[in-house]
Swiss-Prot record:
This is Conjugal transfer protein TraB. The chain crosses the membrane at residues 33-53, 103-123, 144-164, 169-189, 193-213, 287-307, 366-386, 388-408. SUPFAM superfamilies: Carbon-nitrogen hydrolase (SSF56317). It is found in: Cell membrane. The keyword Ribonucleoprotein does not apply. Keywords: Cell membrane, Conjugation, Membrane, Plasmid, Transmembrane, Transmembrane helix. GO terms for cellular component: plasma membrane. Residues 222-421 form the CN hydrolase domain.
Length: 421
């Protein structure tokens, strides 16, 4: 009898041990699968193809399915690092430096995204309310809080790869209602209703893809792309400006009233440059919008200027320059001065020839709050410029353009773009 009891005890212990091992194995596979899927979602959703942006809507689901805060952080890191994978190479190109400089900045930039999503993962809620953390409304509310933080400064300064950008693909023309529907969809993807939400969002996605058309140009507007590499904005010679003026005059036509040139096209904006361009446009019934830099004692402003035969003025001052490479706030804090100045919530919309436009320069096209800020003022068109010579070998410019297209489609606005590569 003692032998039988001992045998049964050993059998029970072995069965329990085998059960724990099986669970551990399943958990490891689940964690690995979640991280691999987050990497795939980041790669596909942010490939630079506008119609693939809704893939990013799967990220909240993967975050919500994470079994621990650590895994939620790993899932967030996999998504964000893959979505922003062009940054290390871009930084290396910009500074003509070692790839490791870009790698360190890439990892540092991901820290905010990972920290926010890991912090809002609802571990306590799951412990207090078994089953309801994943099935109720705790996770949706917490995810929306994380999404809002990543959409607005200060975390929103590096809030790239925001799934909300997919709104324009899912609900083109629906404006703020479409944005609200996408927000609700993101929340539902973290709840027990995620299969129904995924089916509904998938239906809108396929419908949009089947009826997709590119945004139109504003009447009488034209964007001119350039391929001048890193010389654009650095070559201030008379010949350079004359060549650009010739390019503008060649692009002008009977139906063209406004021509848009890329970011930094005019280099340093001075009275001499302004007079040169006014003289060059004499007799041409056209207005030029072009990127330039304006120096002041505190640093410089990255701007859009407008110039015609009869007028020149600064049209727009960039709200959010590229952090670290352009915007270096520590220089101001230490009294050194220098770097590009950020005008966060200034000039969200500007008027030109009776048309209100939403201007976006380069980095502003990668984050959420500048375009939403602009759309509060009901602009008639979006004007997006960039100087992407440093993105060679990456998909950064394609991602910028996909984001601009998505926002233009969401709000039903025409858009004109001009990029230098």
């Amino acid at each position: 009898m003692i032998h039988d009891t001992s045998a049964r005890s050993r059998t029970a212990v072995f069965s329990a041990w085998r059960g724990r091992c099986s669970r551990l194995t399943r958990d490891r596979w689940r964690v690995a699968l979640l991280i691999l899927l987050s990497i795939a979602v980041g790669a596909v959703g942010w490939s630079g193809e506008a119609l693939l942006l809704p893939t990013a809507m799967l990220f909240p689901l993967l975050w919500a399915q994470s079994p621990s805060r650590l895994v939620a952080g790993a899932v967030s890191a996999g998504y964000f690092l893959t979505a922003s994978r062009g940054l290390p190479q871009g930084v290396a190109n910009f500074y003509a430096a070692d790839f490791w400089h870009g790698l360190l900045l890439w990892l540092a930039a991901s820290a905010g995204f990972v920290a926010v999503h890991a912090a809002f993962w609802p571990a306590r809620l799951q412990k207090r309310l078994p089953g309801r953390g994943a099935l109720g409304w705790g996770k949706p509310v917490r995810y929306l809080a994380a999404a809002v933080l990543m959409g607005l400064p200060p975390f929103g300064i590096t809030g790239w790869a925001h799934p909300l950008t997919a709104a324009g693909i899912l609900f083109p023309g629906f404006g703020w209602w479409g944005l609200g529907a996408t927000t609700a969809g993101l929340a539902m993807m973290t709840s027990r209703y995620w299969p129904a939400a995924a089916i509904a969002l998938g239906g809108f996605w396929f419908w949009s893809a089947a009826t997709w058309t590119q945004p139109v140009l504003p009447d009488g507007w034209k964007g001119v792309d350039l391929e001048q590499g890193q010389t654009l904005g650095r070559d201030g010679s008379l010949d350079h400006h004359r060549d650009l003026i010739a390019t503008v005059r060649a692009a002008a036509g009977a139906e063209t009233r406004v021509i848009v040139l890329p970011e930094s096209a005019l280099g340093l904006w001075t009275p001499t440059v302004a007079r040169l361009w006014q003289a060059g446009l004499r007799g041409a019934d056209v207005t030029v919008i072009a990127g330039a830099a304006v120096i002041d004692p505190g640093g410089y402003d990255n701007v859009m200027v407008t110039v015609s035969e009869g007028e020149t003025r600064i049209l727009y001052r960039e709200r959010m320059p590229i952090p670290v490479s352009m915007w270096q706030p520590w220089l101001q804090w230490t009294g050194q001065g220098g770097g590009a100045q950020a005008h966060f919530f200034a000039n969200p919309a500007v008027d030109l020839a009776g048309t209100r436009i939403a201007p976006l320069i380069c980095y502003e096209q990668l984050i959420v709050w500048p375009i939403l800020h602009s759309m509060l003022f009901s602009p008639a068109a979006i004007v997006a410029t960039g100087n992407g010579w440093w993105t060679e070998g990456t998909s950064i410019v394609a991602i910028q353009q996909a984001g601009v297209i998505a926002w233009a489609k969401l709000f039903g606005r025409p858009v004109v773009t001009a990029f230098n590569t």
